Curated annotation (Swiss-Prot):
One of its GO terms (molecular function) is phosphorelay response regulator activity. This is 3',5'-cyclic-nucleotide phosphodiesterase regA. One of its GO terms (cellular component) is cytosol. The phosphorelay mechanism involves the sequential transfer of a phosphate group from Asp-212 of pde2 to 'His-65' of rdeA. Phosphorylation of Asp-212 activates the phosphodiesterase domain. It comes from Dictyostelium discoideum. The lineage of its organism: Eukaryota, Amoebozoa, Evosea, Eumycetozoa, Dictyostelia. Disruption phenotype: Rapid development. Cells are 4-fold more resistant to the antitumor agent cisplatin than are wild-type cells. Additionally it produces fruiting bodies with spore masses that cannot rise up the stalk during development. Mutant cells grow exponentially at the same rate as wild-type. Disruption of regA in a tagB null or in a tagC null background resulted in higher levels of sporulation. Disruption of regA in a dhka null background corrects the defect in stalk formation and suppresses the block to sporulation. Belongs to the cyclic nucleotide phosphodiesterase family. GO terms for biological process: cAMP-mediated signaling; lateral pseudopodium retraction; phosphorelay signal transduction system; positive regulation of chemotaxis to cAMP by DIF-2; positive regulation of release of sequestered calcium ion into cytosol; regulation of protein localization to cell cortex; regulation of release of sequestered calcium ion into cytosol; response to osmotic stress.
Amino acid sequence: MNNKQEEIDQFLSSTSTSPSPSSSSSPSNNDSTSLKSMISGIENLNVHSKGNDNKNNNNNNNNNNSNNNEKQKDIVSLENNSSSNNTTTTTTTTTTSNHNSNNNSNNNNNNINNNNINNNNYEPLVNGHNNGFGDKLNDQPSPSSHRVSDFSDEYSPSKVRILVADDDDVQRKILNNLLKKFHYNVTLVPNGEIAWEYINKGQQKYDLVLTDVMMPHITGFDLLQRINDHPVHRHIPVILMSGTAVDYKYANDTIKIGGQDFLTKPIAKELLKKKIDTVLQSIWQRRKEEEYKATLAQEREKGNKLAKEMELKEHEIEELTKKVSKMSSISKEAMESPLVSVTRNIEELLKQSSWSHYESEIKEKLSSILKELGSSNIYRPSFEKLIKNDSVDPVTKSFLVSEFSSTTSRRNSIPTFPQTTYNRDTKEVIKGWEFDVFKYSEDDLMPLLVDMFENFQLPEIFKIPIEKLQRFIMTVNALYRKNNRYHNFTHAFDVTQTVYTFLTSFNAAQYLTHLDIFALLISCMCHDLNHPGFNNTFQVNAQTELSLEYNDISVLENHHAMLTFKILRNSECNILEGLNEDQYKELRRSVVQLILATDMQNHFEHTNKFQHHLNNLPFDRNKKEDRQMILNFLIKCGDISNIARPWHLNFEWSLRVSDEFFQQSHYETICGYPVTPFMDKTKTTRARIAADFIDFVASPLFQSMAKFLKESQFLLKVISKNRENWQAYMELQKEGKCNDDDLQFMEDPTILVKSKLPKIDEEENRDKVSSSSSSSTAPLTSTSSSNNETSSS
């Protein structure tokens, strides 16, 4: 073994330079166009200049290429006594040496590898966010997918990219020359840490990792574990190498933790190729089989789908034939010409034998004839008769109206407002604290918003056309993202209904004007408009288009406010067109402040300011600043009101918001951003999140609410009971009787906690809630003021 090593050292020292690679396989930043890449490119100018110096020596290095290859063959023969291919082949490799003298090779290797790493402008993917209005925010960030080789071709070493990690310079060079002879594409790195950087952040994707076991910082086993634990890279096969005395133990450990194979140094050339080809050919073949099976399944699915479509088309043709036949008979009956009608009436008159007996009937028929002949649209009655026929389906009626009716307008193509009709009891229910928003669909909820506006006479006072109010509500609904678990239209309605309860059942309207209430209802509906499901912290860390647009300040709240007035600027949704200039300015100022007040980063500032005013000064309804403070307080209470709802509603909302939190922390981890601690599923639970939110955020706010609005004092007991329930869940989790993920499958969330808590006095709570819900404010009365506002008290 010593003789072998001496011969290797002698060969290496006799060669002062080695062939320069024809092309680098290390990641490059040439294609990057981001601001981050440009800055990194400027910082690494020196690195590029060093790379150019290496290129100047390329010609001299190539002159020695054949000699080096011949000498390398001799080295290989020392290990396995086998002959090698005499053909010199240039392959794409990434070297980790500057090819200087043998004495400085180790330091230069490390420097060049570090330069290669620094020269890569890695950019964790944050998909979407390419629009100032956040139109692409629903494209949630995901890690780059592993390169899938072209498995339609046969396996070939020239298609294989191998990453070699070894801290021994000599071993790296030997492996490099061995693998080059078999036409593999090779990237060399001096340690596991750099290898992981290349795998995880480099632009190059690898088909195999060949790593030494004993390396500083990150061992071969550590690198293997990281690859196996990663959702994207876990499919990369790993072969470990070692030359120590406990190889058999390393071999067993390699298989146990998911490695593909183990090699003992020194490695024979043919054995190395056989091991690599065995691993990769099996993967190649397996993926070809999977691809073939997937193709067969797709073809089978297409065949079944086509058969079903043919069957459906035959049924549609049969139904269409029946419909055409039916329509033919209907049209003959309905679409008769006016002259036919007149002729028939006259013929009936002529058949009368004695006109004197039918004088009244004759006058009636003649009057009908004159009316038909004098009509400006004498065909219209027949057309309307056809439209009203019950045998004509809605689609056909819509087609006839849109194509043949002179009253058709562009609005006929726009979706119509849901026409759900509610009785008086339902309209009273939305004033109650126990209103369950989850029992209604979005189409059911939208008409209730119109009722809220009408209850305060806002359409009459501010001249709001009902059609435009409906169009505004539908547009707001459309801009909320349906795939969000928490920040969706249901949440927006829930906040609006809560604030509506404050105004009516809790008598908060007495402190406000009609214009204040108008602004408050708009703000509640729009306060989370187009929310992407990721909070401001994520926007700033990811440097999304929205964070750049609003300079990292209340990013989402500014976005919600901007979209609100963008909708209101549309002529079909402009419910502010009846306001004068002063009213519009005041409403806009108020709406912007209200939506910005929902930014939780400013929560304690708003809360403390309100508490200080409440403790020291009475609120003056004539002061605009006092009314705005009340408005901000009401929308903030509404925004987090789910903690004061009955237990089953608080439970459902808490699950939904924690789902969004956990989703954000998951993507923060993948993208390498700082993980928000209270959202990290590995460090907290749903019950812990809910309990902490009650303790530190919601409870102080609703204590002020109870002092400000006496009718709301019973909410403190509801909050206390909810807090006890969450505490019970935390204790059950500590005892191992309840798993955090099990909470989302519970039909009755009170079952588990009953064993830990005294029975809830449901009757007492129900009486208190119903007594508060039954009280509502009297209709608002109009009073004139300097700016044409009306009082809401």
